[in-house]
Curated annotation (Swiss-Prot):
The lineage of its organism: Bacteria, Pseudomonadati, Pseudomonadota, Gammaproteobacteria, Pseudomonadales. This is 3-ketoacyl-CoA thiolase. Catalyzes the final step of fatty acid oxidation in which acetyl-CoA is released and the CoA ester of a fatty acid two carbons shorter is formed. It comes from the Bacteria. It is found in: Cytoplasm. Its main location: cytoplasm. One of its GO terms (molecular function) is acetyl-CoA C-acyltransferase activity.
Length: 391
């Protein structure tokens, strides 16, 4: 396809191995250090790109306190080969933070406000718990359902509204682990994981080039034995069908098509369309439906045109209604999350948007796909979607 000089293209993508937040590989690595090592690793394998050309480091992070505070984008950038003359900003759109970071870079490129951006995100949920320092306004319950801030209960609500059974959720959770393990065994994550030093369960320092969150031993029988995690009486959502609490970071190099051409780079993909949407916070997990419909309309496409989809697996009870209403349930095995998802890999909030986008691009490359959608729900009722075309 012919590109406009101001089209925004993805030049490369990398991520850390995903670590368990409780005693995991990253337990002795700080969030900004992890981010810096990832950024340096991605730039090191792209020697044609001069770090001094980076206009801005745009980094998603949700709980911006402790080691994730004081503008972690800048804090991480100062630890890398990127010179002090490049800028840095931290973005929070909760679960959609690093996809918003991507959108911000794309919008800047399209409006001639920069040519080279480093985007991504991090969340070290082992060091900074999701509720640390958070003080929700008690008056929120006058404007939205009281349970809107309790993600597990919103998933229960959405699953109940759409008739999603416990068995269907368990099957979805099992699928995530099996596909992620299969992708690992077949080397499908090799291009996207930047190996990192970390500590194993015995405390020994080693290099990790795989995700320690995947549980290949998962069985449907084992999942069926788990108790409801959020609604003890009649609930269907369990720990086994929820995204894992994980430590990790993801990163992309985003450029104008003209600058990529000037440097002789072959981009992975071009961003065709982007969209956001809001929904009732009580069913926050439904957000990807309107945001994806909006993004496809902006791209002049329908879901039938899309070869592959990455939907963040916040909860099986949330993902299945989204897939149902996007008319993807009967095409799930050929199109959706072919390398598993957040149930197996985890959902480090600030990291996930860029992570699913980059995984999508690799899935498309490995399966000769042309058009793809990355989409995710966002706490308190939002959806975010990006349409990519592989180059």
């Amino acid at each position: 396809m012919s590109l406009n000089p101001r089209d925004a293209v993805i030049v490369d993508f990398g991520r850390t191995p995903m670590g368990r937040s409780k005693g995991g590989m990253h337990r002795n690595t700080r969030a900004e250090t992890m981010s810096a090592q990832l950024i340096d690793g991605l730039l090191a394998r792209n020697p044609k790109i001069d770090p001094a050309e980076v206009e801005d480091v745009i980094w998603g992070c949700v709980n911006q306190t402790l080691e994730q505070g004081w503008n972690i984008a800048r804090m991480a950038s100062l630890l890398t080969r990127i010179p002090h003359t490049s800028a840095g900003q931290t973005v929070s759109r909760l679960c959609g933070s690093s996809m918003s970071a991507l959108h911000t870079a794309v919008q800047a490129i399209q409006t001639n406000n920069g040519d080279v951006f480093v985007i991504g995100g991090v969340e070290h949920m082992g060091h900074v718990s999701m509720m640390h320092g958070v003080d929700p306004n008690p008056q929120l319950s006058l404007h939205a359902a009281k349970a809107s801030g309790m993600m597990g209960l919103t998933a229960e609500m959405l699953g109940k509204m759409h008739g999603i059974t416990r068995e269907a959720q368990d099957q979805f959770g099992y699928r995530s682990h099996q596909l992620a393990w299969k992708a690992t065994q077949e080397g499908k994550f090799k291009d996207e994981i930047i190996p990192m030093e970390g500590h194993d369960e015995n405390g020994f320092l080693k290099v990790f080039d795989y995700d320690e969150t995947i549980r290949p031993e998962t069985t449907l029988e084992g999942l069926a034995e788990l108790k409801p995690a959020f609604n003890p009486k009649g609930g269907t959502v369990t720990a086994g069908t929820s995204s894992q609490i994980t430590d990790g970071a993801s990163c992309m190099i985003v450029m104008s098509a003209q600058r990529a051409k000037d440097l002789g780079l072959q981009p992975m993909a071009v961003v065709r369309a982007m969209a956001l949407a809001g929904v009732d916070p009580a069913i926050m997990g439904y957000g990807p439906v309107p945001s994806t419909q909006k993004a496809l309309k902006r791209a002049g496409l329908t879901m039938d045109d899309i070869s592959h989809v990455e939907l963040n697996e916040a909860f099986a009870a949330q993902a299945l209604p989204v897939l149902k209403d996007l008319k993807l349930l009967d095409k799930m095995e050929e199109k959706v999350n072919l390398h598993g998802g957040a149930i197996a890999l985890g959902h480090p909030f600030g990291c996930s948007g860029a992570r699913i986008s980059g995984t999508l691009l690799n899935v498309m490359k490995q399966n000769n796909g042309t058009l793809g959608v990355a989409t995710m729900c966002i706490g308190l009722g939002q959806g975010i979607s990006t349409v990519f075309e592989r180059l």
